[in-house]
Protein backbone atom coordinates (compact mmCIF):
# COMPACT_ATOMS: atom_id res chain seq x y z
CA UNK A 1 0.00 0.00 0.00
CA UNK A 2 1.35 3.42 -0.95
CA UNK A 3 1.67 6.27 1.52
CA UNK A 4 -1.59 8.13 2.06
CA UNK A 5 0.20 11.44 1.55
CA UNK A 6 1.44 10.38 -1.91
CA UNK A 7 -2.06 9.30 -2.94
CA UNK A 8 -3.59 12.55 -1.64
CA UNK A 9 -0.94 14.68 -3.37
CA UNK A 10 -1.68 12.94 -6.65
CA UNK A 11 -5.43 13.52 -6.20
CA UNK A 12 -4.82 17.24 -5.52
CA UNK A 13 -2.71 17.44 -8.68
CA UNK A 14 -5.45 15.70 -10.67
CA UNK A 15 -8.06 18.24 -9.49
CA UNK A 16 -5.74 21.20 -10.17
CA UNK A 17 -4.92 19.91 -13.65
CA UNK A 18 -8.57 19.56 -14.63
CA UNK A 19 -9.32 23.04 -13.31
CA UNK A 20 -6.47 24.75 -15.17
CA UNK A 21 -6.50 22.66 -18.37
CA UNK A 22 -8.51 25.10 -20.52
CA UNK A 23 -6.54 28.21 -19.52
CA UNK A 24 -3.22 26.38 -19.91
CA UNK A 25 -4.22 25.17 -23.40
CA UNK A 26 -5.26 28.70 -24.43
CA UNK A 27 -1.93 30.17 -23.28
CA UNK A 28 0.06 27.41 -24.99
CA UNK A 29 -1.81 28.06 -28.24
CA UNK A 30 -0.84 31.76 -28.03
CA UNK A 31 2.80 30.91 -27.28
CA UNK A 32 3.04 28.49 -30.23
CA UNK A 33 1.25 30.78 -32.73
CA UNK A 34 4.04 32.23 -34.89
CA UNK A 35 1.74 34.80 -36.54
CA UNK A 36 1.28 36.78 -33.30
CA UNK A 37 3.75 39.49 -32.26
CA UNK A 38 6.67 38.37 -30.09
CA UNK A 39 5.65 40.65 -27.19
CA UNK A 40 2.19 39.10 -26.95
CA UNK A 41 3.68 35.60 -27.05
CA UNK A 42 6.18 36.55 -24.35
CA UNK A 43 3.39 37.86 -22.09
CA UNK A 44 1.56 34.55 -22.56
CA UNK A 45 4.75 32.72 -21.56
CA UNK A 46 4.98 34.77 -18.37
CA UNK A 47 1.34 34.07 -17.51
CA UNK A 48 1.93 30.38 -18.14
CA UNK A 49 4.94 30.46 -15.80
CA UNK A 50 2.83 32.11 -13.06
CA UNK A 51 0.32 29.25 -13.09
CA UNK A 52 0.72 26.54 -10.43
CA UNK A 53 3.17 23.81 -11.33
CA UNK A 54 0.90 21.07 -10.05
CA UNK A 55 -1.75 22.26 -12.51
CA UNK A 56 0.17 20.66 -15.38
CA UNK A 57 -1.09 17.31 -16.66
CA UNK A 58 2.46 15.95 -16.83
CA UNK A 59 2.74 16.09 -13.01
CA UNK A 60 -0.01 13.49 -12.52
CA UNK A 61 1.23 9.98 -11.73
CA UNK A 62 -0.85 6.97 -12.76
CA UNK A 63 -1.65 5.05 -9.58
CA UNK A 64 -3.59 1.90 -8.80
CA UNK A 65 -7.15 2.66 -7.64
CA UNK A 66 -7.03 -0.23 -5.16
CA UNK A 67 -3.58 0.05 -3.57
CA UNK A 68 -2.11 3.35 -4.79
CA UNK A 69 0.92 1.57 -6.27
CA UNK A 70 2.62 3.77 -8.91
CA UNK A 71 4.39 1.03 -10.87
CA UNK A 72 3.17 -1.85 -13.06
CA UNK A 73 -0.03 0.07 -13.79
CA UNK A 74 -2.60 -1.06 -16.37
CA UNK A 75 -4.30 2.05 -17.77
CA UNK A 76 -7.31 0.21 -19.11
CA UNK A 77 -8.17 -1.27 -15.70
CA UNK A 78 -6.70 1.54 -13.55
CA UNK A 79 -4.96 -0.95 -11.28
CA UNK A 80 -1.56 -2.52 -10.71
CA UNK A 81 -0.57 -6.03 -11.73
CA UNK A 82 -0.69 -7.22 -8.12
CA UNK A 83 -4.22 -5.93 -7.49
CA UNK A 84 -5.30 -7.33 -10.87
CA UNK A 85 -4.00 -10.78 -9.93
CA UNK A 86 -5.65 -10.75 -6.51
CA UNK A 87 -9.02 -9.52 -7.77
CA UNK A 88 -8.82 -11.82 -10.80
CA UNK A 89 -8.29 -14.87 -8.58
CA UNK A 90 -11.36 -13.87 -6.55
CA UNK A 91 -13.40 -13.51 -9.75
CA UNK A 92 -13.96 -9.78 -9.23
CA UNK A 93 -12.71 -8.71 -12.69
CA UNK A 94 -15.29 -9.47 -15.40
CA UNK A 95 -13.96 -11.46 -18.35
CA UNK A 96 -10.69 -12.40 -16.66
CA UNK A 97 -10.08 -16.14 -16.40
CA UNK A 98 -7.04 -18.01 -15.17
CA UNK A 99 -5.02 -19.44 -18.04
CA UNK A 100 -4.73 -23.21 -18.41
CA UNK A 101 -3.50 -25.36 -21.29
UniProtKB/Swiss-Prot annotation:
It holds the Pfam family Ribosomal_S14. Residues 1-20 are annotated as: Disordered. The keyword RNA-binding applies. Residues 1-11 have a biased composition (Basic and acidic residues). Keywords: Ribonucleoprotein, Ribosomal protein, RNA-binding, rRNA-binding. GO terms for cellular component: cytoplasm; small ribosomal subunit. Disulfide bonds: none annotated. GO terms for molecular function: rRNA binding; structural constituent of ribosome. SUPFAM superfamilies: Glucocorticoid receptor-like (DNA-binding domain). GO terms for biological process: translation. Belongs to the universal ribosomal protein uS14 family. Part of the 30S ribosomal subunit. Contacts proteins S3 and S10. NCBIfam families: PRK08881.1 (NF006477). This is Small ribosomal subunit protein uS14. It comes from Xanthobacter autotrophicus (strain ATCC BAA-1158 / Py2).
Amino acid sequence: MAKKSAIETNERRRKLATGHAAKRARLKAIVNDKTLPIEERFQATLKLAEMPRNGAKIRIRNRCEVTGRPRAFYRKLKMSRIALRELGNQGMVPGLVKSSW
